[in-house]
Amino acid sequence: MGYAGGTKKNPTYYSLGNHTETIQIDYDPARISYAQLLDIFWKSHQPDRKSWSRQYMAAVFYHTDEQKQRALQTRDREAKRLQTKIQTEIIPVTPFYLAEAYHQKYYLRQVPELVKEYAARYPELNAFIGSTAVSRVNGYIGGHGSLESLQKEIAGLGLSPAGSRRLTEIVQALDKNSRYAAQGGAYCPVPF
């Protein structure tokens, strides 16, 4: 989690300037394509909803003309599918500034016993936020995954038996009410 899209150097949550809260995705194009990431992105938010502030606006930040064109094509496809104007911005990337530590992995931070396990394994902030397992668990706690998908990968998430049980309890409760579960899973699939 961090800030991008603005001109202020070294923004913080309380001194954001004209930046937007966003994430930076580092990916291996041999495993998942930019087009696939865009498809996940469009399914994972409401692109026709106008944001009430620049801080929280939905945006695609592109690095190349090719990425820009692909983002515009998929935006137009979504506008046609939804039969409405798309409010999601498509803008050139600016420097990405990592947000403060307490903003990282927000959903996971709501479950102290799981944070404690991962903090012991990843004591450095960059290792903690860069961990695939930490990111996956944060997503599950945020309601972005089904109990079925968790059960398939829980052994590889690096949790103790107690941590695994706690995560399973959380996902069981969320799975019953999750809009993502009801839609068949508009969350990032496990890369194989």
List each language-model region with its residue ranges.
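Flexible coil/turn and secondary-structure edge motifs
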Residues: 1-192
